[in-house]
Protein backbone atom coordinates (compact mmCIF):
# COMPACT_ATOMS: atom_id res chain seq x y z
CA UNK A 1 0.00 0.00 0.00
CA UNK A 2 1.14 3.53 -0.83
CA UNK A 3 0.55 4.81 2.70
CA UNK A 4 2.80 2.04 4.00
CA UNK A 5 3.01 2.30 7.76
CA UNK A 6 1.02 5.55 8.00
CA UNK A 7 -1.84 4.59 10.31
CA UNK A 8 -3.29 7.69 11.88
CA UNK A 9 -6.42 8.04 13.96
CA UNK A 10 -9.03 10.66 14.90
CA UNK A 11 -8.77 10.43 18.68
CA UNK A 12 -5.97 10.82 21.22
CA UNK A 13 -3.53 12.17 20.56
CA UNK A 14 -4.39 13.42 17.10
CA UNK A 15 -7.22 15.59 18.43
CA UNK A 16 -5.26 17.47 21.13
CA UNK A 17 -6.02 20.87 19.55
CA UNK A 18 -9.64 20.09 18.63
CA UNK A 19 -12.50 21.23 20.87
CA UNK A 20 -12.46 19.09 24.02
CA UNK A 21 -13.77 15.57 23.51
CA UNK A 22 -14.15 15.80 19.74
CA UNK A 23 -12.37 13.69 17.11
CA UNK A 24 -10.38 15.28 14.29
CA UNK A 25 -12.89 13.96 11.73
CA UNK A 26 -12.46 11.35 9.04
CA UNK A 27 -12.12 13.79 6.13
CA UNK A 28 -9.29 15.64 7.89
CA UNK A 29 -7.64 12.37 8.96
CA UNK A 30 -7.69 10.92 5.43
CA UNK A 31 -6.39 14.20 3.96
CA UNK A 32 -3.68 14.48 6.63
CA UNK A 33 -2.42 10.95 6.01
CA UNK A 34 -2.07 11.58 2.28
CA UNK A 35 -0.26 14.86 2.94
CA UNK A 36 2.07 13.03 5.37
CA UNK A 37 2.92 10.55 2.62
CA UNK A 38 4.06 13.38 0.34
CA UNK A 39 5.54 15.45 3.18
CA UNK A 40 4.22 18.46 1.30
CA UNK A 41 4.23 21.41 1.69
CA UNK A 42 7.13 22.48 3.85
CA UNK A 43 5.12 25.54 4.86
CA UNK A 44 1.47 26.50 4.62
CA UNK A 45 0.07 29.92 3.71
CA UNK A 46 -2.64 32.22 4.99
CA UNK A 47 -5.11 31.76 7.82
CA UNK A 48 -8.73 30.72 8.20
CA UNK A 49 -11.50 31.26 10.75
CA UNK A 50 -15.09 30.10 10.86
CA UNK A 51 -17.97 30.05 13.32
CA UNK A 52 -18.83 26.73 14.91
CA UNK A 53 -20.91 25.45 17.78
CA UNK A 54 -17.69 25.83 19.82
CA UNK A 55 -17.28 29.50 18.88
CA UNK A 56 -14.87 30.89 16.33
CA UNK A 57 -12.21 28.38 15.30
CA UNK A 58 -9.03 29.71 13.67
CA UNK A 59 -5.72 28.49 12.32
CA UNK A 60 -2.64 30.23 10.92
CA UNK A 61 -1.08 28.09 8.17
CA UNK A 62 2.03 30.24 7.81
CA UNK A 63 4.40 27.95 9.73
CA UNK A 64 7.06 25.38 8.90
CA UNK A 65 5.55 21.90 8.92
CA UNK A 66 7.99 19.47 10.53
CA UNK A 67 7.06 16.27 8.71
CA UNK A 68 9.91 14.31 10.24
CA UNK A 69 8.47 14.97 13.71
CA UNK A 70 5.25 13.20 12.67
CA UNK A 71 5.52 9.44 13.16
CA UNK A 72 3.79 7.14 10.70
CA UNK A 73 2.39 4.80 13.31
CA UNK A 74 -0.31 5.23 15.91
CA UNK A 75 0.58 7.78 18.57
CA UNK A 76 1.16 6.38 22.05
CA UNK A 77 1.88 9.79 23.57
CA UNK A 78 1.16 13.44 22.83
CA UNK A 79 2.79 14.82 19.68
CA UNK A 80 2.11 18.52 19.19
CA UNK A 81 3.32 18.57 15.58
CA UNK A 82 0.83 15.89 14.49
CA UNK A 83 -2.03 17.31 16.56
CA UNK A 84 -1.44 20.86 15.34
CA UNK A 85 -1.25 19.71 11.73
CA UNK A 86 -4.43 17.59 11.92
CA UNK A 87 -6.33 20.44 13.58
CA UNK A 88 -5.16 22.84 10.87
CA UNK A 89 -6.44 20.52 8.16
CA UNK A 90 -9.76 20.19 10.00
CA UNK A 91 -10.13 23.98 10.27
CA UNK A 92 -9.27 24.39 6.56
CA UNK A 93 -12.23 22.07 5.85
CA UNK A 94 -14.67 23.93 8.16
CA UNK A 95 -14.98 20.79 10.28
CA UNK A 96 -18.21 20.42 12.23
CA UNK A 97 -16.78 19.17 15.51
CA UNK A 98 -18.93 16.97 17.74
CA UNK A 99 -18.14 14.43 20.48
CA UNK A 100 -20.16 11.81 18.59
CA UNK A 101 -18.25 12.38 15.34
CA UNK A 102 -16.79 15.35 13.49
CA UNK A 103 -17.78 15.86 9.88
CA UNK A 104 -17.44 18.01 6.80
CA UNK A 105 -17.83 17.67 3.04
CA UNK A 106 -15.06 15.85 1.22
CA UNK A 107 -15.63 18.18 -1.73
CA UNK A 108 -13.93 20.92 0.34
CA UNK A 109 -10.57 19.12 0.21
CA UNK A 110 -9.23 20.31 -3.19
CA UNK A 111 -9.92 24.00 -2.46
CA UNK A 112 -8.35 23.76 1.02
CA UNK A 113 -5.24 22.04 -0.33
CA UNK A 114 -4.79 24.74 -2.97
CA UNK A 115 -5.55 27.72 -0.73
CA UNK A 116 -3.68 26.84 2.48
CA UNK A 117 -1.17 24.19 1.43
CA UNK A 118 0.00 25.34 -2.04
CA UNK A 119 -1.16 22.24 -3.89
CA UNK A 120 -1.36 22.55 -7.69
CA UNK A 121 -4.49 23.70 -9.48
CA UNK A 122 -5.10 20.24 -10.98
CA UNK A 123 -5.99 18.71 -7.59
CA UNK A 124 -9.62 17.70 -7.99
CA UNK A 125 -12.40 15.45 -6.81
CA UNK A 126 -14.47 13.03 -8.85
CA UNK A 127 -17.89 11.53 -8.23
CA UNK A 128 -18.29 7.78 -8.74
CA UNK A 129 -21.79 8.38 -10.14
CA UNK A 130 -20.25 10.23 -13.11
CA UNK A 131 -18.48 7.09 -14.34
CA UNK A 132 -19.36 3.58 -15.37
CA UNK A 133 -18.02 0.86 -13.08
CA UNK A 134 -15.16 0.01 -15.45
CA UNK A 135 -14.27 3.67 -16.00
CA UNK A 136 -14.16 4.24 -12.24
CA UNK A 137 -11.93 1.22 -11.59
CA UNK A 138 -9.61 2.37 -14.39
CA UNK A 139 -9.47 5.90 -12.93
CA UNK A 140 -8.64 4.67 -9.42
CA UNK A 141 -5.97 2.31 -10.77
CA UNK A 142 -4.42 5.10 -12.87
CA UNK A 143 -4.13 7.29 -9.79
CA UNK A 144 -2.64 4.49 -7.70
CA UNK A 145 -0.23 3.49 -10.48
CA UNK A 146 0.94 7.12 -10.58
CA UNK A 147 1.68 6.95 -6.84
CA UNK A 148 -1.36 8.99 -5.82
CA UNK A 149 -3.60 7.51 -3.11
CA UNK A 150 -7.31 8.16 -3.64
CA UNK A 151 -9.32 9.77 -0.87
CA UNK A 152 -12.66 8.00 -0.92
CA UNK A 153 -15.99 8.76 0.70
CA UNK A 154 -18.86 6.35 1.11
CA UNK A 155 -22.04 6.21 3.08
CA UNK A 156 -25.78 6.27 3.14
CA UNK A 157 -28.68 7.81 4.99
CA UNK A 158 -27.06 7.06 8.37
CA UNK A 159 -23.89 9.01 7.62
CA UNK A 160 -20.68 8.74 5.67
CA UNK A 161 -16.99 8.03 6.14
CA UNK A 162 -13.87 9.30 4.35
CA UNK A 163 -10.92 6.92 3.94
CA UNK A 164 -7.94 6.29 1.68
CA UNK A 165 -7.58 3.76 -1.13
CA UNK A 166 -3.84 3.16 -1.41
CA UNK A 167 -3.34 -0.06 -3.33
CA UNK A 168 -4.83 -2.94 -5.30
CA UNK A 169 -4.08 -6.49 -6.40
CA UNK A 170 -4.21 -8.05 -9.85
CA UNK A 171 -7.60 -9.52 -8.85
CA UNK A 172 -9.05 -6.00 -8.37
CA UNK A 173 -9.04 -6.22 -4.59
CA UNK A 174 -8.43 -2.73 -3.24
CA UNK A 175 -6.63 -1.82 -0.02
CA UNK A 176 -8.17 0.84 2.21
CA UNK A 177 -6.80 2.75 5.18
CA UNK A 178 -9.86 3.57 7.27
CA UNK A 179 -8.18 6.24 9.43
CA UNK A 180 -8.81 4.28 12.60
CA UNK A 181 -5.23 3.68 13.68
CA UNK A 182 -4.42 0.73 11.49
CA UNK A 183 -7.74 -0.63 10.35
What feature does the model see in each segment?
Residues 179-183:
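Conserved catalytic-core surface of thiol
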Residues 22, 27-34, 105, 109-113, ...:
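Stable alpha-helical elements in mature extracytoplasmic
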Residues 111, 116-177:
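Active-site-adjacent substructure of cysteine-protease-like catalytic cores
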Residues 10-11, 33, 77, 106-107, ...:
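Residue-identity detector for glutamine
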Residues 101, 105, 132:
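Catalytic cores of large soluble enzymes that bind and process phosphate-bearing ligands
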Residues 1-102, 169:
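Active-site-adjacent structural segments surrounding the nucleophilic cysteine of cysteine proteases
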Amino acid sequence: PLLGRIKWNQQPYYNTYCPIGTPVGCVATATSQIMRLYKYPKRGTGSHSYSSSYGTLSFNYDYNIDWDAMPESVLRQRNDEVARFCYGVAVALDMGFSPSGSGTWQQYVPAALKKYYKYPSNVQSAERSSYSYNQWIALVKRELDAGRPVQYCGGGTGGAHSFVCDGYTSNNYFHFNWGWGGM
